[in-house]
Swiss-Prot record:
Domain notes: The tetrapeptide (A-A-P-[AV]) repeats found throughout the protein are also present in many proteins constituting the protective envelope of other species.
Organism superkingdom: Eukaryota
Keyword Repeat: yes
Protein name: Cuticle protein 16.5, isoform A
Molecular function terms, GO-annotated: structural constituent of cuticle
Provenance organism: Locusta migratoria
Entry keyword set: Cuticle, Repeat
Keyword Magnesium: no
Signal peptide limits: none
Length: 175
């Protein structure tokens, strides 16, 4: 599953309760069966949701402002990205290509290398199914002992690994 939310270390000075999910509210944390992030609050179900930078997901991830939504893939918006079983980039001009989990990027820039992706400003680099998003930076390792790290406030969980820091994105395959 994209979000097996097995939570690793959390760098929060606030309250944290995570039986099956986590809710972060700048920098407070409450748990549900998923995770939700909203400016920088976080709430989710079996996936992750972030808002402003907002992200919401079910079996995938959705981010908004920069917004991202995904099912078995990932979608980012503003820079916006939406995913299906492949990857589609629409960045002014728009770019589309198919990949493993599908991703759609819209603005500002996207560069793709092999199964990896390089997204600039906010920047995203994707190599295999791993992802790193910076400013608020996000690092996402989809197949590797999944873990997520959110900085400011910071979050670390193991499901698909994600690191959100400040907004740049890089995807890496941990194969």
């Amino acid at each position: 599953g994209l979000l097996g939310l097995g939570y690793g270390g959390y760098g929060y000075g606030a309250a944290l309760a995570a039986p099956a999910a986590v809710s972060y509210a700048a920098p407070a944390i409450a748990a549900a069966p998923a995770v939700s992030y909203a400016a920088p609050a976080i709430a989710a179900a079996p996936a992750v949701s972030y808002a402003a930078p907002a992200i919401a997901a079910a079996p995938a991830i959705s981010y908004a402002a920069p917004a991202i939504a995904a099912a078995p893939a990932v979608s980012y918006a503003a820079p916006a990205i939406a995913a299906a079983p492949a990857i589609s980039y629409a960045a002014a001009p728009a770019i589309r290509y198919a990949a493993a989990p599908a991703i759609r990027y819209a603005a500002p820039a996207v560069a793709r290398v092999a199964p990896a992706i390089s997204y600039a400003a906010v920047a995203v680099a994707r190599v295999a199914p791993a992802l790193s998003y910076a400013a608020p930076a996000l690092s996402y390792a989809r197949y590797a002992a999944p873990a997520l790290s959110y900085a400011a406030p910071a979050v670390s969980y193991a499901a698909p690994a994600i690191s959100y820091a400040a907004p740049a994105i890089a995807k890496y395959a941990l194969h």
